[in-house]
């Protein structure tokens, strides 16, 4: 996949750029899975996207992903609006294959217009606590979507120790 074009995805004149937050989901938050309706019903849009990483099916029955440390653009905070602004500041990151044993992971790009309402419940679901011990960390990476590169937030595990590595896409 050649991702090099700059593109504005899902823009709406009523949305302030500072309030748009894009989240890449690869598991139970995807359409058709048990957490989607509860946590993503308020999304402005949802579309296919890809990121680089290693995907695992955990023994607990849900997925986790590792992402290359060198691809992390920012780390999540307890301030959803600051995180949305940071995403806008990053702009169009480079999306390229990292060195090492990484896969192109397929998931969905979920665009929210009210990060203060939408992000804290997902952070709680994922066990993300900025500055504390977290099950998942929310980090920003580059994603490929519609032949464009875009900065997205993603929940990742620093190291997966209790799951089976799977290829490309989690299907439950």
Where are these regions (language model features)?
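Glycine-aromatic micro-motifs
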Residues: 2-172
């Amino acid at each position: 996949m050649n991702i090099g074009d700059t593109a504005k995805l899902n823009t709406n004149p009523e949305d302030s750029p500072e309030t748009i937050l894009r989240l890449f989901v690869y598991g139970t938050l995807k359409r058709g899975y048990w957490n989607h309706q509860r946590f993503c019903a308020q999304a402005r849009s949802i579309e296919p996207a890809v990121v680089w990483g290693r995907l695992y099916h955990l023994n607990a029955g849900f997925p986790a992903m590792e992402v290359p440390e060198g691809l992390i653009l920012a780390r999540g905070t307890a301030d959803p609006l600051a995180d949305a602004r940071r995403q806008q500041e990053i702009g169009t990151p480079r999306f390229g294959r990292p060195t090492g044993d990484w896969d192109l992971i397929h998931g969905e790009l979920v665009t929210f217009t009210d990060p203060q309402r939408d992000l804290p419940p997902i952070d709680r679901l994922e066990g993300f606590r900025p500055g504390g011990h977290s099950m998942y960390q929310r980090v920003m990476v580059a994603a490929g979507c519609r032949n464009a590169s875009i900065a997205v937030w993603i929940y990742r595990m620093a190291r997966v120790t209790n799951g089976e590595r799977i290829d490309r896409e989690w299907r439950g």
